[in-house]
């Protein structure tokens, strides 16, 4: 199984307004099929006021610029006709500030007030987020404070209220009925106060649902493992970082430790990736990777057990340095051709890094057998031919600082994988490993 994360606004335009949309995605199915994609993860598509879409104001309507419900269903049908499943990003930890529920709560409606989390006399109003020290409690003009872990425009939902749980369960069932195949649950570790409570929450929430359920649990291994047994798929932030760090330092140690910690022996599928919307792109890691190091990172990604997930444009070497508050710089328009003046091209903003005639386009790289796209296509074909690797076991055969060798195997298959992280040729067991290359035998 191979996944592909898409920021809809930047991917493909279907109505010539420069904004990516459902019609554009429908028109892009052939490219994704050629790339070997089995499921697409669409970043939030619901009505919201932000560019990123994680502050939903109506879960039952789509962003107007993305298209209608009819176009959404037609898009899903086109994906399904090509054997590609659709996974939606679903941020149900909170709503947007302008959501009808929160607006009614602000006006004093007791029913909807209990949909959110409010401070009381015992609340520490100076409580701060663990990752950046920002305040969690936000004031209103009347002196009340509400909880918004992800900022004042994203008030937290109150899951102590069973009606909130039921509302979100109805939403999930509604979307599944529309043909959606699964969800990436945003901020999944923050639904309840403790690991144990959070695990119970998700176990109950998902108990009667079937689909692809990805969890964003950016945390230590124990929390990831506890949730993985429920979700079945876990975004592997640990190995994502360590692939890049190992390639950057030309040293295998952090990668070996991460594979042992986050890949081997799991009773769920790690979803491995090299970048996403919350970090700098692969090509821009630590100031920028060479073409050889980008390709090596992709090779490692596609030769690990679990599910490889590609962030749109990483198959082209798109650049982007994540920096607050302008995080949209990692969400540049996807370049379909060199001039970026072609039907389907999005242009909702000027590219911060990946402008016209940069060599970063589908058109240009399809003509070049040595391109990052051609390299990625080779690995996606490899995974399609070896789908057993998703659940393969991994045994290290050699752990040198500059190169590593491991065996992937199950009851019927076996392959040896050789990664050379150095700039010099290496020979091991008769296999020549060129600089920054991967060999599979």
Curated annotation (Swiss-Prot):
Monomer. One of its GO terms (molecular function) is alpha-amylase activity. It catalyses: Transfers a segment of a (1->4)-alpha-D-glucan to a new position in an acceptor, which may be glucose or a (1->4)-alpha-D-glucan. Its cofactor is Ca(2+). Belongs to the glycosyl hydrolase 13 family. The record marks 278 as: Transition state stabilizer. This is 4-alpha-glucanotransferase. Its EC number is 2.4.1.25. It is an enzyme of class 2 (transferase). The active site is at residues 186, 216.
């Amino acid at each position: 199984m191979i996944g592909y994360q898409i920021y809809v606004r930047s991917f493909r335009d279907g109505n010539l307004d420069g904004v990516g949309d459902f019609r554009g995605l429908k028109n892009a199915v052939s490219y994704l099929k050629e790339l070997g994609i089995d499921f697409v993860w669409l970043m939030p598509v619901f009505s919201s006021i932000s560019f990123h879409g994680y502050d939903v104001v109506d879960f039952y309507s789509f962003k107007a610029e993305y298209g209608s419900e009819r176009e959404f269903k037609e898009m899903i049908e086109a994906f399904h006709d090509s054997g590609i499943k659709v996974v939606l990003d679903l941020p149900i930890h909170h709503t947007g500030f302008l959501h009808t529920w929160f607006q009614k709560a602000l006006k004093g409606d007791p029913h909807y007030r209990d949909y959110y989390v409010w401070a009381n006399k015992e609340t520490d109003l100076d409580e701060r987020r663990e990752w950046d020290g920002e305040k969690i409690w936000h004031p209103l003009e009347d002196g009340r404070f509400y909880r918004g872990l992800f900022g004042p425009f994203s008030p937290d939902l109150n899951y102590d209220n069973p009606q909130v749980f039921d509302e979100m369960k109805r939403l999930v069932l509604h979307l599944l009925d529309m043909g959606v195949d699964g969800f990436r649950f945003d901020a999944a570790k923050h639904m309840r106060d403790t690991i144990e409570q959070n695990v119970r929450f998700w176990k109950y929430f998902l108990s009667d649902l079937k689909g692809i359920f990805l969890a964003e649990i950016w945390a230590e291994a124990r929390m990831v493992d506890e949730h993985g047994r429920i979700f079945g798929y876990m975004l592997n932030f640990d190995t994502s970082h360590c692939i890049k760090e190992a390639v950057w330092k030309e040293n295998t140690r952090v990668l070996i430790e991460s594979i042992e910690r986050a890949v081997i022996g799991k009773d769920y599928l790690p979803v491995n990736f090299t970048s996403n919307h919350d970090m700098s792109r692969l090509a821009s890691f630590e100031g920028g990777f060479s073409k050889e190091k980008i390709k090596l990172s992709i090779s490692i990604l596609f030769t690990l057990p679990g599910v490889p997930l590609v962030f749109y444009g990483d198959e082209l070497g798109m650049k982007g340095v994540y920096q607050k508050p302008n995080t949209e710089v990692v969400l540049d328009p996807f370049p379909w051709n060199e001039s970026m003046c072609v039907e389907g091209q999005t242009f909702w903003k000027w590219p911060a890094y990946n402008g016209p005639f940069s060599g970063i386009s589908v058109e240009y790289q399809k003509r070049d057998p040595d391109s990052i796209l051609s390299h990625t296509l080779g690995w996606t074909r490899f995974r399609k031919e070896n789908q057993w690797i998703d659940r393969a076991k991994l045994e290290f055969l050699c752990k040198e600082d500059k190169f590593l060798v491991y065996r992937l195997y199950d009851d019927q298959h076996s392959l040896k994988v050789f990664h050379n992280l150095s700039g010099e040729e290496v020979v091991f067991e008769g296999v020549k490993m060129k600089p920054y290359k991967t060999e599979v035998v």
